[in-house]
From Swiss-Prot:
Highest taxon listed in the record's lineage: Eukaryota
Main location: nucleus
One GO CC term, this protein: membrane
Species of origin: Homo sapiens
Name listed for the protein in its UniProt record: RNA polymerase II-associated factor 1 homolog
Ranges for region Interaction with PINT87aa: 150-300
Compositional bias segments (type: Basic and acidic residues): 361-374, 399-434, 442-453
Family membership noted in the UniProt record: Belongs to the PAF1 family.
Coiled coil: 352-400
Alphabetized UniProt keyword annotations: Coiled coil, Isopeptide bond, Nucleus, Phosphoprotein, Transcription, Transcription regulation, Tumor suppressor, Ubl conjugation, Wnt signaling pathway
Composition-biased stretches (Low complexity): 476-485, 498-507
Quaternary state and interactors: Component of the PAF1 complex, which consists of CDC73, PAF1, LEO1, CTR9, RTF1 and SKIC8. The PAF1 complex interacts with PHF5A. Interacts with POLR2A, TCEA1, SKIC3, KMT2A/MLL1, SUPT5H, RNF20 and RNF40. Interacts with UBE2E1. Interacts with PINT87aa which is encoded by the circular form of the long non-coding RNA LINC-PINT; the interaction enhances the binding of the PAF1 complex to target gene promoters and may anchor the complex on target gene promoters, sequentially pausing RNA polymerase II-induced mRNA elongation. (Microbial infection) Interacts with influenza A strain H3N2 NS1 protein; the interaction interferes with host cell gene transcription, specifically with that of antiviral genes.
Role: Component of the PAF1 complex (PAF1C) which has multiple functions during transcription by RNA polymerase II and is implicated in regulation of development and maintenance of embryonic stem cell pluripotency. PAF1C associates with RNA polymerase II through interaction with POLR2A CTD non-phosphorylated and 'Ser-2'- and 'Ser-5'-phosphorylated forms and is involved in transcriptional elongation, acting both independently and synergistically with TCEA1 and in cooperation with the DSIF complex and HTATSF1. PAF1C is required for transcription of Hox and Wnt target genes.
TM ranges: none
Length: 531
């Protein structure tokens, strides 16, 4: 860059006062102003003032009544663009011999793959596994070989196989034959495993529903880790966990959790004594349990979304195999301890057994009725009605007979009619009861699960009076058998809590059936059979 030279004249011009070289400021007023004083400054800061009027009042458009009432002309063609000839039917007839446009013929041609006979074209699809791939993004050559089969060929193959493998029962006769076939297949002897030909059965036992223990609802309790105490192991730990109990509790902050209780040494001795004496419990004894762990709980039952049915099997020597339903699944995860705060929960659970009340007996009878009662279908009901009508017509014909036969048959007809009325009443009561059970089944099950985990108001009142006890002692193990009979004609049951057994197959609640109720059910069955 060339140097800049400043002359003396330029220096003098630079040191001249500004008043000589500044021009007067132009006024914003067109006319000549007499006084040239400028306006004074604003004495206060600017402020935002709210605009009190609607901003859309000058731009908003509202149609008048004349514009609303005016009917605009709709200018369309008379055929609305659809040319339909109703007189000449040959108008829309397609000529099969018409020549297609060359562009359309090209679209309708089938794709014919030219034979690749040249040696160079055969090497294009060859994949060499030891050679480095030059394409890092494409996933086309990730396999050792390229399938030349078209994907269009395999469309619908899985659906076709599904239809061939599964039998679709479209009518009632095919359903009946399929059901009868299941009974025939059950009579066939099992000679080998269905998928392992070399595996042969050692013993074959029939599988039946557990009518004896079905009245007791069972739950599967799943722990995230082994709940056994650290200081015990082996048979002692299994014995302690088989007598364990879970109970819902609430801390000082109002948070709910599940407490895992283990029996104390004195309780273990009492349970061992009861087992040796072949009795469930001593009526006057009190069993103590101490808290061992705290868990967060997650319950799923039939009312929950995505529930899967679960069953467990009970093997009884010389009797067979029985299955029962696990209608509730409880997942327990360890409760996190607060930072810097040591858990000070030192609870003691006191259990004393009592007889079952009417509400619990009714719940057991309802579960038993779900397993035993059979609701007839519409066709069966119609057949029963026709049979009753025919029986009524035969009664009228018999009444027209001789007086001696009439006198002899009156007692029989009156007895059969009374039995029919009783049977109809029993069926009506069973239907109404089953309908009510189905409608309130979900709500009752959810309430029962909450009551069994966190207790009920009746239990809290009984604990306050120290007269009643907890309802439920769980027995763990899928093959654990609890056969009990009535002692002294009274009913006694274990408590109502869910099982805290570590075995995944579930728990059994032992309960004793009443002989008088069994006799009543047998008499009602006899009445229905007499119909």
């Amino acid at each position: 860059m060339a140097p800049t030279i400043q002359t003396q004249a330029q220096r003098e011009d630079g040191h001249r006062p500004n008043s000589h070289r500044t021009l007067p400021e132009r006024s914003g007023v067109v006319c000549r102003v007499k006084y040239c004083n400028s306006l004074p400054d604003i004495p206060f800061d600017p402020k935002f003032i709210t605009y009190p009027f609607d901003q859309n009042r000058f731009v908003q458009y509202k149609a008048t009544s004349l514009e609303k009432q005016h009917k605009h002309d709709l200018l369309t063609e008379p055929d609305l663009g659809v040319t339909i000839d109703l007189i000449n039917p040959d108008t829309y007839r397609i000529d099969p011999n018409v020549l297609l446009d060359p562009a359309d013929e090209k679209l309708l041609e089938e794709e014919i793959q030219a034979p690749t006979s040249s040696k160079r074209s055969q090497q294009h699809a060859k994949v060499v596994p030891w050679m480095r791939k030059t394409e890092y993004i494409s996933t086309e050559f990730n396999r050792y070989g390229i399938s030349n089969e078209k994907p269009e060929v395999k469309i619908g193959v899985s659906v076709k196989q599904q239809f061939t493998e599964e039998e679709i029962y479209k009518d009632r006769d095919s359903q009946i034959t399929a059901i009868e076939k299941t009974f025939e297949d059950a009579q066939k002897s099992i000679s080998q495993h269905y998928s392992k030909p070399r595996v042969t059965p050692v013993e074959v036992m029939p599988v039946f529903p557990d009518f004896k223990m079905w009245i007791n609802p069972c739950a599967q309790v799943i722990f995230d880790s082994d709940p056994a105490p650290k200081d015990t192991s082996g048979a002692a730990a299994l014995e302690m966990m088989s007598q364990a109990m879970i109970r819902g509790m609430m801390d000082e902050e109002g948070n709910q959790f599940v407490a895992y209780f283990l029996p104390v040494e004195e309780t273990l001795k009492k349970r061992k004594r009861d087992q040796e004496e072949e009795m469930d419990y001593a009526p006057d004894d009190v069993y103590d349990y101490k808290i061992a762990r705290e868990y967060n709980w997650n319950v799923k039952n039939k009312a929950s979304k995505g529930y899967e049915e679960n069953y467990f099997f009970i093997f009884r020597e010389g009797d067979g195999v029985y299955y029962n339903e696990l209608e509730t699944r409880v997942r327990l995860s360890k409760r996190r301890a607060k930072a810097g705060v040591q858990s000070g929960t030192n609870a003691l659970l006191v259990v004393k057994h009592r007889d079952m009340n009417e509400k619990e007996l009714e719940a057991q009878e309802a579960r038993k009725a779900q397993l035993e009662n059979h609701e007839p279908e519409e066709e069966e009901e119609e057949e029963m009605e026709t049979e009753e009508k025919e029986a009524g017509g035969s009664d009228e014909e018999q009444e027209k007979g001789s007086s001696s036969e009439k006198e002899g048959s009156e007692d029989e007809h009156s007895g059969s009619e009374s039995e029919r009325e009783e049977g109809d009443r029993d069926e009506a009561s069973d239907k109404s009861g089953s309908g009510e059970d189905e409608s309130s089944e979900d709500e009752a099950r959810a309430a029962r699960d909450k009551e069994e985990i966190f207790g009920s108001d009746a239990d809290s009142e009984d604990d306050a009076d120290s007269d009643d006890e907890d309802r439920g002692q769980a027995q763990g193990g899928s093959d654990n058998d609890s056969d009990s009979g009535s002692n002294g004609g009274g009913q006694r049951s274990r408590s109502h809590s869910r099982s805290a057994s570590p075995f995944p197959s579930g728990s059994e609640h032992s309960a004793q059936e009443d002989g008088s109720e069994a006799a009543a059910s047998d008499s009602s069955e006899a009445d229905s059979d007499s119909d």
